From Swiss-Prot:
Function per UniProt: Part of the ABC transporter complex AraFGH involved in arabinose import. Responsible for energy coupling to the transport system.
Subcellular location, record wording: Cell inner membrane
Record field: catalytic activity: L-arabinose(out) + ATP + H2O = L-arabinose(in) + ADP + phosphate + H(+)
Alphabetical list of Pfam families matching this protein: ABC_tran (PF00005)
Protein name: Arabinose import ATP-binding protein AraG
Membrane topology qualifier: Peripheral membrane protein
Organism: Shigella boydii serotype 4 (strain Sb227)
The EC number(s) this enzyme carries: 7.5.2.12
PROSITE patterns on file: ABC_TRANSPORTER_1, ABC_TRANSPORTER_2, ARAG
Length: 504
């Protein structure tokens, strides 16, 4: 039951940077003992608001009220000492220090200038035990997993007696088990009466955790949902982007050309039975299946990331021998991989380099000198045409959002002579607005005659974008559905593992 008095209130918050109005008149309330989700597209203002709350930024207008008192923090340390902690996606810890030292950094117990390590480890151990973590406080942080690092960040907040804890995309680098543990801890913190702010693009997380959801759009407050029994995915999407869910996908019937890609009894590691399918020029075929269905494994095999062990791949009726990615690229088949950060981009290189890295071999001068003029023009062209949001082509790609990283990968392949594109989870970790832009790029590629084969575990996405849906189950094709006839019940029925009829 919602309390009558909010513990945290934002009152008319505005924030202006030179030439940019990031927030305008943001007002809403948060209550103790609740998880309050913040949702919106990239650039909607969520992170800016958290930075105001944590003392990184001062508001241009408005105020933050905590437990009835108007607060103003000069920096993050002042906010933390006042009980406000932000757990960012990029964790702010020191790998070479111990767990205990990280938890009490800035307030190490000491006497006469000498740290009392016995007391330090004891106090840190209590915080870790509070979180259900069996970790030696004297362990150097660098030996722990990312999920354990996150628990140390939370312990650090609890050591300051934080009453307000905000999580900014906390699950982006976690395993399924670590996510379950994080959710357990968040629910415990809620029971203790803390205010939990939670920022995520993942709808399933929002619905699993939240007691209330506030939506932002273009730096403005849109709506707060407080009755979680009455809110659904479609209502959230409409609030976030200002259009109906059907408009997000934007599928239209189209005509197709000749067969462009054909798999004839193809097998690869993780693909249990031979796979045969065809994709025509201008056709979008979606691969859907549950975890372990073999979608990603098939994609990797087709691109040469793993070895095809049987069967034949044809492009434009010509057999293609694919033993490594360069063979696939030479044949006109490109891949946007599932793990974008590990396999799709070179994080410490620029947007320009990431776009040009594949095609630059065709444009070198004298066989060995990079053609800077071509590279600048090519990168700028794709940044404009794909609406890649970046300060410039020389910006490190790791500083871009997931959606803009994905568009840069697409720009890379648009620089090649593309016949087939393989898209493996192309919108995972991307906000709704950026998804819409990715879908439009997919449609544009199809209109140019490219054969599109895309794998996704997001069933509404597959049903909304694909002309034809191929359902995989346990490494084999379980069935096909046409766009106009497909629904979630049919697709899930095909995707579910078979139940043995044997009687013990």
């Amino acid at each position: 039951m919602q309390q009558s008095t909010p513990y945290l209130s934002f009152r008319g918050i505005g924030k202006t940077f030179p030439g940019v109005k990031a927030l305008t008149d943001i007002s809403f309330d948060c209550y103790a003992g609740q998880v309050h989700a913040l949702m919106g597209e990239n650039g909607a203002g969520k992170s800016t608001l958290l930075k105001i709350l944590s003392g990184n930024y001062a508001p241009t207008t408005g105020s933050v009220v905590i437990n009835g008192q108007e607060m103003s923090f000069s920096d993050t340390t002042a906010a933390l000492n006042a009980g406000v902690a932000i757990i960012y996606q990029e964790l702010h810890l020191v790998p070479e220090m111990t767990v205990a030292e990280n938890i009490y950094l800035g307030q190490l117990p000491h006497k006469g200038g000498i740290v009392n390590r016995s007391l330090l480890n004891y106090e840190a151990g209590l915080q870790l035990k509070h979180l259900g973590m069996d970790i030696d406080p004297d362990t150097p942080l660098k030996y722990l997993s990312i999920g354990q690092w996150q628990m140390v960040e939370i312990a650090k907040a609890l050591a300051r007696n934080a009453k307000i804890i905000a999580f900014d995309e906390p699950t982006s680098s976690l395993s399924a088990r670590e996510i379950d543990n994080l959710f357990r801890v968040i629910r415990e913190l809620r029971k203790e009466g803390r205010v939990i702010l939670y920022v995520s693009h993942r709808m399933e997380e929002i619905f699993a955790l939240s007691d209330a959801i506030t939506v932002f759009k273009d730096g403005r407050y849109v709506k707060t949902f407080t009755d979680m029994q009455q809110v659904d995915h479609d209502a959230l999407v409409q609030a976030m982007v200002g259009r109906d869910i059907g408009d997000i996908y934007g599928w239209q019937p189209r005509s197709y050309g000749e067969e462009r890609l054909r798999l004839d009894a193809v097998k690869a590691p993780g693909v249990r039975t031979p796979i045969s399918l065809a994709v025509r020029s201008g056709e979008i075929v979606g691969l859907f299946g549950l975890v372990g269905a073999g979608r990603s494994e098939l994609m990797k095999g087709l691109f040469g990331g793993t070895q095809i062990t049987a069967g034949q791949v044809y492009i434009d009726q010509q057999p293609i021998d694919i033993r490594k990615p360069s063979h696939a690229i030479a044949a006109g088949m490109m891949l946007c991989p599932e793990d974008r950060k590990a396999e799709g981009i070179i994080p410490v290189h620029s947007v320009r380099d990431n776009i040009n890295i594949s095609a630059r071999r065709k444009h070198v001068l004298g066989g060995c000198v990079i053609n800077n003029g071509w590279e600048e023009n090519n990168a700028d062209q794709h940044i404009r045409s794909l609406n890649i949001k970046t300060p410039g082509a020389e910006q490190l790609i790791m500083n871009l959002s997931g959606g803009n990283q994905q568009k840069a990968i697409l720009g890379r392949w648009l620089s090649e002579e593309m016949k087939v594109i393989l898209l493996d989870e192309p919108t995972r970790g991307i906000d709704v607005g950026a998804k819409h832009e990715i879908y439009n790029v997919i449609y544009a590629l199809a209109a140019q005659g490219v054969a599109v084969l895309f794998a996704s575990s997001d069933l509404p996405e597959v049903l909304g974008v694909a002309d034809r849906i191929v359902v995989m189950r346990e490494g084999e094709i379980a069935g096909e559905l046409l766009h106009e006839q497909a629904d979630e019940r049919q697709a899930l029925s095909l995707a579910m593992p078979k139940v043995s009829q044997a009687v013990a």
